[in-house]
């Protein structure tokens, strides 16, 4: 079966690498253009492009996959199916109708829940107990197509974004191979999503990263782990923006929201609107991530200081 892979970040690159390892016939790759990244704003290739070049796969980087040159490339490689993972751009009807078997997206949520760009982060932020991966046939409406394959996993209470994403990548690898085998054997039976149950996971904005310590300890814990380790949950300390990582525990004791109540080797107990949360790491502006214990010993932080979650654009 002739497969074109469409994707951009590391999530997609890991899946592509595995597909090549398993001998899937990848006849072409589509990814986003190179973009400036990091403090130096150096132009870097996408992780998917890196894998494509490493494996000698034909790869294009159109501004839009719906443009003439991209459509010509797709026609030239004559795919049976397009596999899409975290591409970040909309596929138009000409692309969707081009492959013999259609276009299928690998989406890290239990659709119809968490349609959109940030399903892993939003599931963690909302304190979901389970999530999963859905492979569905793409239609014009975002993440609304009929489901071909779906698998569920439990979310651990203190699992971070990095940890959960890694597990969902591994699940996606297994599922895409299973899906392609079933597709080739005519064993795919699509089922429509229940659109009345749809929820959404919009693109993350900077204001979403700030911790509101007036909320309860569970809510604060979930906010921190949803953005751990990237891009990091935010707060203000003495007027400076800091990042928080490693939400480890919650306690029913009460204290002033945002107040750093107690610091030990395991972290800092911080007050919230209901209970306290224990957080292990804090990153000061322009510095590396350190434990609260290290910061206290370095006289950079002390008990009685207050973290605030206000955000002004």
From Swiss-Prot:
Binding site for (6S)-5,6,7,8-tetrahydrofolate: 109-112
Reaction equations catalysed: L-methionyl-tRNA(fMet) + (6R)-10-formyltetrahydrofolate = N-formyl-L-methionyl-tRNA(fMet) + (6S)-5,6,7,8-tetrahydrofolate + H(+)
Source organism, top-level taxon: Bacteria
Pfam families, per the entry: Formyl_trans_C, Formyl_trans_N
EC number, UniProt record: 2.1.2.9
Swiss-Prot/TrEMBL keywords: Protein biosynthesis, Transferase
GO MF term list: methionyl-tRNA formyltransferase activity
Key word Transferase present: yes
HAMAP family associated with the record: Formyl_trans (MF_00182)
NCBIfam families in the cross-refs: fmt (TIGR00460)
Protein name: Methionyl-tRNA formyltransferase
Organism of derivation: Thermotoga neapolitana (strain ATCC 49049 / DSM 4359 / NBRC 107923 / NS-E)
Upper lineage: Bacteria, Thermotogati, Thermotogota, Thermotogae, Thermotogales
Gene this protein is translated from: fmt
């Amino acid at each position: 079966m002739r497969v074109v892979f469409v994707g951009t970040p590391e999530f997609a690159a890991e899946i592509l690498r595995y597909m090549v390892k398993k001998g899937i016939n990848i006849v072409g790759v589509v990814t986003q253009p190179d973009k400036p990244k990091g403090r130096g704003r150096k132009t870097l290739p996408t992780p998917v492009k890196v894998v494509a070049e490493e494996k000698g796969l034909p790869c294009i980087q159109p501004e839009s996959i719906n443009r003439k040159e991209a459509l010509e490339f797709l026609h030239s490689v004559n795919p049976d199916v397009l596999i899409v993972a975290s591409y970040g751009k909309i596929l138009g009807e000409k692309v969707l109708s081009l492959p013999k078997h259609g276009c299928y997206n690998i989406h890290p949520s239990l659709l119809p829940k968490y349609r959109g760009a940030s399903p892993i982060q939003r599931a963690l932020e909302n304190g979901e107990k389970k999530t999963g991966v859905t492979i569905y046939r793409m239609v014009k409406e975002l993440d609304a197509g009929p489901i071909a394959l779906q698998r569920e996993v439990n979310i651990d209470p203190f699992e971070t974004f990095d940890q959960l994403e890694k597990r969902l990548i591994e699940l996606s690898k297994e599922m895409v191979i299973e899906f392609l085998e079933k597709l080739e054997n005519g064993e795919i039976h699509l089922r429509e999503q229940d659109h009345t149950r749809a929820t959404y996971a919009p693109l993350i904005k900077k204001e979403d990263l700030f911790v509101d310590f007036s909320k309860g300890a569970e809510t604060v814990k979930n906010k921190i782990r949803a953005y751990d380790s990237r891009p990091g949950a935010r707060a203000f300390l003495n007027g400076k923006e800091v990042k928080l990582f490693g939400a480890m525990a919650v306690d029913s004791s009460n204290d002033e929201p945002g107040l750093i109540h107690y610091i030990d080797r395991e972290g800092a107990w911080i007050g919230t609107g209901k209970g306290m949360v224990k957080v292990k790491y804090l990153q000061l502006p322009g510095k590396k991530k350190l434990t609260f214990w290290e910061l206290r010993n370095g006289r950079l932080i002390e008990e009685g200081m207050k973290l605030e979650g206000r955000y002004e654009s």
